């Protein structure tokens, strides 16, 4: 889902960067006042490294499409949406500067859809369904978050005239729906494992 350099006009890319940095600054200010800041910093560093590595690889599928996971929904379940957005920013920055994944000028757009929008939607949907069943909440929120990020990217690319809306919907939506379903199932397994091995990791206040 990384948007490369050259697809978005500079003015639009700059606008996305400014919006993303303003939102991230608010998130950082809010989370920096939490009493468990030291634990948050450690987990933020560890999870950022995991996201950088995990999202840099693709997995071949029988459909002939390379599967690329997001990991950020899992970070939301552990750290909450604000810290997850910051993790996304750090991971995308490292990938853009050091690994050539995603464009430097498109950093703001990538953070906006794969970090901020994804994290907030995952958390909101999780809270909505968590009273019904935790596993259902994990699955549905992962799927809805990734689909929301996909629609955000389609919107960004459409107004940049990178391609037509019809082509973007037809090419991106089915693929990321498949990824979302797979990642939702995987997140259930991982969260169940964490809960049984060391539930204290999940004790961090999410917002």
Regions found by a protein language model. Name each.
Residues 1-7, 159-170:
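Membrane-interface helix termini and inter-helical loops of multi-pass transporters
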Residues 2-74:
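Hydrophobic transmembrane alpha-helices
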Residues 17, 41-46, 85-89, 112, ...:
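Hydrophobic alpha-helical transmembrane segments
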Residues 18-24, 115-125, 181-193:
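Hydrophobic cores of alpha-helical transmembrane segments in multi-pass inner/ER membrane proteins
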Residues 33-38, 76-87, 131-136:
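Membrane-helix interface "capping/anchor" motifs
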Residues 56-65, 90-121:
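Interfacial aromatic-anchored transmembrane helix boundaries in multi-pass membrane proteins
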Residues 111-153:
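Short helix-perturbing small/polar motifs within transmembrane alpha-helices
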Residues 136-147, 165-207:
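C-terminal transmembrane helix-loop-helix hairpin of multi-pass membrane proteins
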